[in-house]
Design a protein with these regions (language model features):
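N-terminal helical cap/lid subdomain that shapes the substrate entry/recognition surface
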Residues: 17-136, 147
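Receiver (REC) domain switch/active-site residues of two-component response regulators
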Residues: 175-176, 230, 249-250
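Phosphate- and divalent-cation-binding pockets in alpha/beta enzyme and binding domains
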Residues: 45, 86, 137, 160-164, ...
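Substrate-recognition "cap/lid" segment bordering the active-site pocket of phosphatases
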Residues: 131, 150-151, 155, 159-212, ...
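Non-catalytic pre-domain segments flanking phosphatase-related domains
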Residues: 1-29, 105, 264-272
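Short acidic-hydrophobic, aromatic-tinged amphipathic segments that line or gate anion-handling sites
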Residues: 251-256
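Conserved acidic donor-binding loop of glycosyltransferase catalytic domains
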Residues: 235
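Hydrophobic beta-strand scaffold residues
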Residues: 152, 231-232
Length: 272
């Protein structure tokens, strides 16, 4: 037990569906790793950025560094966070400090923002080459919720959110979008602070206790818990179910298709 709410294995998908469509008014969903299979592209872009940067840093200083780990470093330091915060946290783990800079920094500037902007260039290149796939279970679940009358918001630290939603034909699914551009414009703190999700709930005119947060990132689940949202669903894409629960997820699923009518029982129960 983590102290962030009791979990029971007695909940069935049927009971969860009843809560979904009668108790709650809105869904606030992350994008990368929940709706679209773009998390791996982000991780690869970060690896390209940091491995190159640390090699150049080694050439200048003689210090050596452990290369970026696609699984552990992405999950712990970057997933779900604004770019500049992720750059700061990863470099701190390697004992490197840089100035914050500003959002408009050129990609060759050695600042948190500058490196983040270079990462976006790498991501754009990968996206153009590979395209975007969705998680069908997520799309089916969100469309069912929309048809059932729930308001919908996408909340993402990504600056590519609108572009990706358009590419997969899901723009019209959402009533509100709070993405990296909006987070920068409003100067909101990123995950694990709840401000992005709270802003989405405010725009939807839905109190947090009546909204569901869906996240695959530990920092995002922590944000949902910090915002006192009525239900936080953790999507376990990286074999971290226990960690998602520890951060405050009420329910953890491998795929949101598990929560569709007639599917199997979720791994823990929603709050009553």
């Amino acid at each position: 037990m983590n102290g962030r709410g009791s979990h029971s294995a007695s909940a069935t998908t049927k009971s969860f569906q009843r809560l979904n469509f009668e108790k709650y008014e809105a869904i606030l969903s992350d994008l990368d790793g929940v709706i679209t299979k773009t998390a791996r592209l982000h991780a690869a872009a970060w690896k390209r950025l940091f491995d190159d940067y640390l090699q150049r840093f080694t050439a200048k200083t003689g210090r050596t560094f452990k290369p970026f780990d696609l699984e552990e470093d992405y999950r712990v330091h970057l997933d779900g966070k604004p770019r500049q915060d992720g750059v700061r946290d990863f470099l701190k783990s390697r004992g490197v400090s840089l100035p914050l800079g500003s959002p408009g920094d050129h990609a060759d500037r050695e600042t948190f923002y500058g490196l983040g902007n270079q990462k976006d260039r790498y991501f754009d290149s990968a996206l153009e080459k590979t395209g975007v796939d969705v998680y069908p279970g997520t799309v089916e679940f969100l469309r069912l919720a929309k048809r059932s009358g729930l308001k919908m918001a996408v909340v993402s630290s990504s600056h590519h959110c609108a572009q990706i939603l358009d590419a997969v034909g899901l723009t019209a699914l959402f009533d509100v979008r709070v993405d990296g551009h909006e987070i920068d414009r409003l100067q909101l703190p990123g995950n694990p602070a709840p401000d992005g999700f709270l802003e989405a709930a405010r725009r939807l005119v839905v109190p947090p206790r009546r909204a569901i947060v869906i996240e695959d990132a530990l920092a995002g689940v922590e944000a949902g818990h910090a915002g006192a949202f009525g239900l936080v669903i953790g999507v376990n894409r990286r074999n971290q179910a226990d960690a998602l629960r520890d951060k405050g997820a009420h329910i953890v699923v491998e795929d949101l298709a598990e929560l569709l009518p007639g599917r199997t029982e979720p791994s823990s129960s929603p709050p009553r």
